[in-house]
């Protein structure tokens, strides 16, 4: 398998087809605005985001985690708030899709169809890895620019602190998946 990484420019996006974006090291909000704009401008374009767990949220790690925990538990009800809602995602792929959804006009047909054309995955799925030639795009404007005293955390770290059981289950599945991927690559 041949993996090529290229910078992605919104003016050079194809009008139709599929674009795979590697989210590793990107700031979540910046990448989400870029993707939302591309989905709205090109109605026949599908965007696949991989490595969503490596997206970055800037800010103090404790502050970000406490904000997520407060958002999850702030709805006080007499019965189970998880059944009633609002539903707050915990997994990185769902968190990112929710961020993009917030930037789309989800009540209109264009926004709903744009959201249907977005796929977000944690790590890279096997069906994408098995392609002969894989082009992963990066958005230079959305990459994290490291500077002194910059504080940030990844969505995976947030998920690990919010829901450690689900994170541990996913981590074990990734190890099994990695072994299968090595077998596919070698044989």
From Swiss-Prot:
CDD domains: Ribosomal_L13. One of its GO terms (biological process) is translation. The keyword Ribonucleoprotein applies. InterPro entries: Ribosomal_uL13, Ribosomal_uL13_bac-type, Ribosomal_uL13_CS, Ribosomal_uL13_euk/arc, Ribosomal_uL13_sf. Keywords: Ribonucleoprotein, Ribosomal protein. PROSITE patterns: RIBOSOMAL_L13 (PS00783). The keyword Ribonucleoprotein applies. It comes from the Archaea. Belongs to the universal ribosomal protein uL13 family. This is Large ribosomal subunit protein uL13. It comes from Pyrobaculum aerophilum (strain ATCC 51768 / DSM 7523 / JCM 9630 / CIP 104966 / NBRC 100827 / IM2). The gene is rpl13.
